[in-house]
Each structure stands twice: as C-alpha cells, then as structure tokens.
Amino acid sequence: MQISGYTFRLFQSHPLANTSKNICDISSKSTICRLKDVIHIGFKWINDYKLLKNWQDFSALFYKHLKDTDTLDPFYFELLDSASQNWNKQNSKRVAIESYVKLLAHEGRLHNEFECFLCASSIKEDDISLLRAFLPTHKICSHTFGIKKSSLNELFQNKSTLFLNNNEVDRLWYILLEGL
C-alpha cells in the first residue's frame, strides 16, 4: 500500500490517539487538518474545585521546572501519574509534598543532612526551618516557622508525610509553591 506524502506528513505531525484512531479530519477547504473526537482525560476529582486548584498549582511548577529541557526522563511522567491517582484518596497537599521530595531525591537536591543553608553550621535544634527547595535552616537564621526534626527525617527518608500535622503540611505546601 502506497501512502501519499501528504498523508505521511499528516501522521507524522498528528500521531494516533490512545485508541489507535486517527484524530485528524482532512478538509478540502484548508491545508490544516482539524482535530476530531478529542476528549479530555478526566479524573474523579476534576469537579472538586480545591483539588483541581491544587493540581493546577502543582503541575504548573513542573512546566517552569522542565520547560528548557530537550529530553525528559520517564520519572517525571510516572511521578505525575502516581500523584494524579492518589490526589483524591489522600490530602492533595500531602501527595504533592511527597512527590516533591521524590523529585528532589531523584535530582540529587534533597538535603537530608540538616546543615543550615544560610550559616553552613550543623542544625542541632529539634525544630528546623525550610526554605525554597526544602533547604534546611536554623529558625533564627531564616526567621520562619520550624518543623520537628524527627518529622522531617521521616519525610526525607521514607517520602511520607504521616508524622506531619496539618499546619506543617500547609507550611510545606507554601514552600513548595515558591518553586521547584
């Protein structure tokens, strides 16, 4: 079977959809194809405004973080996919924080040695403050709220927010929104 050059270019520029159907409609009125039968892949939580807003804020950080890369590791897709599946099963902020810690660990930017980012001395206090990218600091150095060292250790080692209370999760959420 011979494929014309136009049809070949069409399939190159518009790949087949997940259902293995052609998603382009060829029109004799124009040289540009029209997309047909394209639907939004929905989630169970898509109609919940708070969950959707948190998802948009979280996924927008990935655009800013990955926009200049040429190739992407499948890790990023798998991370977002697993987060989207757990988004309505758990507190969405907890899912985002756990995913962010996994991202930092994958990229080698997770600072779990608890050395102050600002003064470069070891943090011996029980409360640790965090800055953007979850950089640890003394409460005195950063003048921000602290989080228990044992809870942060659990978060960084096991990627779990189980031992964080809701106020600490909200604090980490706002730090997360500062950027990846």
Kindly give the residue locations of the regions a language model identified:
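Non-catalytic alpha-helical scaffolds and adjoining flexible linkers that form interface surfaces
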Residues: 1-180
